[in-house]
């Protein structure tokens, strides 16, 4: 599948990526190759593969939720770059 220059520019605009004319040509070739590969994969017969197939045979890999040792407040703050009133002090995330 060969993408047009306009299609590549449209995708770049949606992704908020500025591309030079040279980059558009490179991306056009690369994206077209990726889409060709996807088209090839779509032709693979997977009718005998169960939808939830996996190879490890494991049914659950989660450990039991067990309460363990906890750090004291002093231990937790020991390497904090900045602290105030016994709490981590971080730069504001939201502006008022």
Curated annotation (Swiss-Prot):
The keyword Ligase applies. It catalyses: L-glutamyl-tRNA(Gln) + L-glutamine + ATP + H2O = L-glutaminyl-tRNA(Gln) + L-glutamate + ADP + phosphate + H(+); L-aspartyl-tRNA(Asn) + L-glutamine + ATP + H2O = L-asparaginyl-tRNA(Asn) + L-glutamate + ADP + phosphate + 2 H(+). The keyword Transit peptide does not apply. InterPro entries: Asp/Glu-ADT_sf_sub_c (IPR036113), GatC (IPR003837). Signal peptide: none annotated. GO terms for biological process: glutaminyl-tRNAGln biosynthesis via transamidation; regulation of translational fidelity; translation. Heterotrimer of A, B and C subunits. Allows the formation of correctly charged Asn-tRNA(Asn) or Gln-tRNA(Gln) through the transamidation of misacylated Asp-tRNA(Asn) or Glu-tRNA(Gln) in organisms which lack either or both of asparaginyl-tRNA or glutaminyl-tRNA synthetases. The reaction takes place in the presence of glutamine and ATP through an activated phospho-Asp-tRNA(Asn) or phospho-Glu-tRNA(Gln). NCBIfam families: gatC (TIGR00135). This is Aspartyl/glutamyl-tRNA(Asn/Gln) amidotransferase subunit C. It comes from Chloroflexus aggregans (strain MD-66 / DSM 9485).
């Amino acid at each position: 599948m060969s993408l047009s220059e306009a299609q590549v520019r449209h995708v770049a605009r949606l992704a908020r990526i500025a591309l030079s004319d040279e980059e558009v040509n490179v991306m056009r070739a690369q994206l077209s190759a990726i889409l060709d590969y996807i088209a090839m994969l779509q032709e693979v017969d997977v009718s005998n593969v169960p939808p939830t197939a996996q190879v490890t045979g494991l049914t659950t890999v989660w450990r039991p939720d067990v309460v363990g040792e906890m750090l004291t407040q002093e231990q937790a703050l020991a390497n904090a770059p900045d602290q105030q009133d016994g709490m981590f002090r971080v730069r504001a995330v939201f502006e008022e």
